[in-house]
Amino acid sequence: FSGTQKKTAEKFSKEIAYLDKFCWKIEQKYGFTMSELEYGPGIAVPYFKDQEDTLEADIKVIKTAISGMKWKGKVMLEMGRAFVASCGYYLTCVHECKKNNDRNYCIVDGGMHQIQYDGQIRGMYQPKCRMYPDGREGKKEKWTICGALCTANDVLVRDIELTAPGEGSVIIFENAGAYAMTEGMSLFLSHELPAV
């Protein structure tokens, strides 16, 4: 494992070249042949709106770099977040909607203690999420979704466009399958954990 959320494929090539040189050196200098190498590349997950999904391109770069290794042992990839992020969703219910100084707010029963994306700070980046039921009648407006904690930091999303959210509406956060719940402070103030 050499890091997480890497933004450039060039890092994978450099790391694999370094590992190749290291494995080859151990074999040549000490006569010890490693049969396996496990590599956790740290492929980035596009958690937020307008982030590009580079998974396929990154895997091609990694495959090419591994194929070109001088060391010929077995390489296993620990794919971590890159493969499991899309396997989970976080659902939270709207408990109250209000307006303050021309800004719309949805207060939900969850919060930052239950969902936390790598790089998310007070809703500054918009995670991929939607409302259920969708297709309500009304005007599409910008909303700020705030959690249930008594802190101004508990902002999950700012300026998301929703049509007529109300009490009981469900906000569905995507890409919650890897660390999104465990990176939060789940038991903060003895709040219940979300159901799995």
Identify the residue ranges that each predicted region occupies.
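Charged (often Lys/Glu-rich) extended helix/loop segments that serve as interaction or gating elements
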Residues: 74-196
